[in-house]
Amino acid sequence: MGKLTTHILDLTCGKPAANVKIGLKRLGESIMKEVYTNNDGRVDVPLLAGEELMSGEYVMEFHAGDYFASKNMNAADQPFLTIVTVRFQLADPDAHYHIPLLLSPFGYQVYRGS
């Protein structure tokens, strides 16, 4: 059974990013799900699993600006990024897809994890 998971790390403090809003949709469709990360920077259940996970292109929207704004940063350090959009393709509905996001107020890195 395939699944889609994610994990967000805050590079400014080297800790998981809790309470980050994530939107997920299939390309060309409206938002399928909106979830928030837990204290470990993960979502409590897979974003997609089983029959929900179908081949195709998807978009995840990580609401980075809201997250960093909640950290009471100095005005000069207000985040440059508001929403990090990641567009990706799921080819095998039986595979486990994990998309980690390494995040700072001014940049990010995303990759297919394991």
UniProtKB/Swiss-Prot annotation:
Its EC number is 3.5.2.17. Substrate binds at H7, R42, Y111. InterPro entries: Hydroxyisourate_hydrolase, Thyroxine_BS, Transthyretin/HIU_hydrolase, Transthyretin/HIU_hydrolase_d, Transthyretin/HIU_hydrolase_sf, Transthyretin_CS. Pfam families: Transthyretin. SUPFAM superfamilies: Transthyretin (synonym: prealbumin). Transmembrane segments: none annotated. GO terms for biological process: purine nucleobase metabolic process; urate catabolic process. Keywords: Hydrolase, Purine metabolism. It is an enzyme of class 3 (hydrolase). Induction: Expression is very low in excess nitrogen (glutamate plus ammonia) and is induced by TnrA during limiting-nitrogen conditions (glutamate). Expression is further induced when allantoin or uric acid are added during limiting-nitrogen conditions. Pathway: Purine metabolism; urate degradation; (S)-allantoin from urate: step 2/3. HIU hydrolysis also occurs spontaneously, but more slowly. Homotetramer. Belongs to the transthyretin family. 5-hydroxyisourate hydrolase subfamily. Catalyzes the hydrolysis of 5-hydroxyisourate (HIU) to 2-oxo-4-hydroxy-4-carboxy-5-ureidoimidazoline (OHCU). This is 5-hydroxyisourate hydrolase. It comes from Bacillus subtilis (strain 168). The lineage of its organism: Bacteria, Bacillati, Bacillota, Bacilli, Bacillales.
